[in-house]
């Protein structure tokens, strides 16, 4: 077995998923091979949750290529207790709202209860847990990854965990001994089971007796700690079956491996240093089950800060797909799992450019470095919906943002063809697919309010320039008409034209922005004008239309 942190780094294979698949295959697994991930549906599912889904997906695809039948399971740990109130929630249309916009009191009164026993704050699903699980399902569907969502609540209710619960309770002395190696405050009274109070619904931790023959435990509904807070128990004394409660996380996770027959599971570095070592020991010593092949990944950050549903610093898959094509988003997860990555929305253009180079590498662009081409050979077929016969036509993201300044589809096409980003012999399908990026880039410009967040003035604005500025604009029009300059040549000519006509260069740029954007400022004018239809530019510079 490779070191926990080395598996999947790409040091053994050009694409890390192949190295992970090698480890799984070396165990000669039964089919279907089961790849697992999981999340507690505590709030809005965000991009970070897709680390497990996408890492698992690429390993699953690598194994499928080798002829294995693979099942990709994702557990929604919806029998976990609500420990604190999230700052943000989302309805099923992905409208993100603050806690104050729903019945926060109803959520507060349900602290300590399982997510599936808490009413949906939007009133559309069976429970809080069902609501956020549905959002997760829709996100996976939107990104095009077929996962089998499994509810922990349903597994408990169906008896799937019965044997694991019985083993944990029957071997509770061993369980205590194992857990005490990884966790403080494990005394002789510790029992690895949380009964659910029949009176108030709280998951309590005070077990008074165990009847293995009857499959029940006695309990007292006592106070439980939730972070820095204490949730008061109601004091009820009763009995609970193995299905009316749950295992603690450090036992439930390895129990899932046994119940679902898990062969491979990626997880974040937080589990690598805590839950994984204890889970591995519990799996072997309490459940007599070999743990799956593990793989650790680094977390993502969002604009430099940790992604967190509870803290409200999130970006959803739905939001990202407004800004990027699905293949570009999937590509994000092909990168080395060992390195932390920041999803910086303001610099998405750089990331899209990186994807375009990656794609070009797959199609043999020799300017792409050898190691990147090797990775593209393996990973590119997994990130696209359908492998194209020839390289797709891609408009650079920032240029697409320029095209997004107008809603005129014909003008967009003219500008893209004029710039050479869409070849004249492109098919109708290639053109439509290339232009799809324009709406994505426009959404990015609006979201970040960057230098591309302007609208092209499609009719001549009301302008009045002094004689020197008017002469400079006419001279610039003649230059464009006769020279058909590229973007940098035109940018330089604007400076030279201003000097020759004794016009302040800032004033000449402002005049250009007024003519084309009806604004006093804007993006670099040379690249903007060189991207447009030449006749349109000449006529506008001459104030003719």
From Swiss-Prot:
Pfam families: tRNA-synt_1f (PF01921). InterPro entries: aa-tRNA-synth_I_codon-bd_sub2, aa-tRNA-synth_I_CS, aa_tRNA-synth_I_cd-bd_sf, Lys-tRNA-ligase, Lys-tRNA-ligase_SC_fold, Rossmann-like_a/b/a_fold. It is an enzyme of class 6 (ligase). Its main location: cytoplasm. Gene3D superfamilies: 1.10.10.350, 1.10.10.770, HUPs, Lysine tRNA ligase, stem contact fold domain. It catalyses: tRNA(Lys) + L-lysine + ATP = L-lysyl-tRNA(Lys) + AMP + diphosphate. GO terms for biological process: lysyl-tRNA aminoacylation. GO terms for molecular function: ATP binding; lysine-tRNA ligase activity; tRNA binding. One of its GO terms (cellular component) is cytoplasm. A motif ('HIGH' region) lies at residues 41-49. It comes from the Archaea. The keyword Cell wall biogenesis/degradation does not apply. It is found in: Cytoplasm. Its EC number is 6.1.1.6. PANTHER family: LYSINE--TRNA LIGASE. HAMAP family: Lys_tRNA_synth_class1 (MF_00177). Belongs to the class-I aminoacyl-tRNA synthetase family. This is Lysine--tRNA ligase.
